[in-house]
Amino acid sequence: MLITVLDVGGTHVRWARWSPEQGLGDVRRTSSPSTFRQPGVSVDESRAVLVRMMAEVVPAGAVAGVSFGAALDHRTRAVYASAPLWGVDSRPFDLVAALRGARPDVRWHVVNDVTAALLHLASTQRARGLRKVWLATISTGVACRVIDQRTGEIPVDGCGLQGEIGHLPATVAVDGLPLDLRCDCGRQGHVAAYASGPGIRRLGEVLRHRRGPVWVASDLAQELARGEPFEVALTRAVRSGDTVAVELLAAAAKPIADIVRTSLCLDPELDLVAFTGGVALGLGEHYLAAVLAHLDRDGLYLTSERKPDWIRDRMAVTEVSGLVGAGIAALSEELT
């Protein structure tokens, strides 16, 4: 079965054709319509543009699998909110109904983007034979999912949600002074306010003001002055050992390390703890090292002292495809 797969994120909409036999075809992409890109456009208008965009790329009579970057109810597929796409607006949106209304000839299947990425990771050789797999995406937003490989289950709560860690409260300090940064959802002090791509840029502004001439002389500031995008500048500066960039990454990694610590403390069956998304992949092993540095300093009671490799050996930065995961989810639903 050939499936049209789409991945809707806060930055891009991507689409391709996929099948288990042929794999993923050529991927095309365009900019995501959002209230951040078009501040004068209402959320309803932005949603309508997005639905039209998605509907136009699917062939007649096709099956479509969608990886969607939003908190959504995995029982009903109702979309609750997407801070990167629609900011503070949290009115439920029946995306599946809107897509079916635009293209009733298509069989639509929608899952959350982190769920899709996790389904792809769970299908790989690396994840086979494991008990549970934990995956967090660190990108325009931050979220996490856990799958029990023995049953294939991704449990959800009373709202059909799991792992919306980006909107948990977090504590981050610079020079010993706690910061209270604003998340894209409108609330203060969330994990994503510090650890997402936009959050790291906000932290960068704090350091720019706090460090003054040290910031100006830093590799990070020099890269930015040459017109490099922030993510590229940060990655280059971290790789060069720039102290300001390393400090910035350490601050951004702390809320994620806090969540990993708690996750492993409560569930030792997590055999793989993985990170993906633009931020984590761009920084690669440097991102993992920043998280592990926090866990080395403040780890699991007794375990970190007596079995220090127990945490390190199960952690990785890995590239997975929400497009492939959307295809896997759609195929599974088609066959049931």
Residue ranges of model-derived segments:
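Glycine/GP-enriched mid-protein hinge/lid loop-to-helix segment characteristic of carbohydrate kinases
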Residues: 2, 18, 26-28, 36-40, ...
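Adenine-nucleotide phosphate-binding core of ATP-dependent small-molecule kinases
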Residues: 39-59, 187, 191-193, 199-202, ...
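Glycine-rich beta-strand-to-loop/alpha-helix junction loops that act as flexible
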Residues: 64-70, 138-140, 272-281
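Glycine-rich phosphate-binding loops at beta-strand->alpha-helix junctions
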Residues: 12, 263-298
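Glycine-rich phosphate-binding loop and adjoining helix at the ATP-binding site
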Residues: 35-47, 63-64, 71-134, 164, ...
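Conserved A3 ("GATE") glycine/threonine-rich loop of ANL adenylate-forming enzymes
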Residues: 11-12, 116, 139-143
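Conserved glycine-rich phosphate/nucleotide-binding loop
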Residues: 9, 297-336
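Conserved phosphate-binding loops in N-terminal lobes of ATP-dependent enzymes
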Residues: 2-78
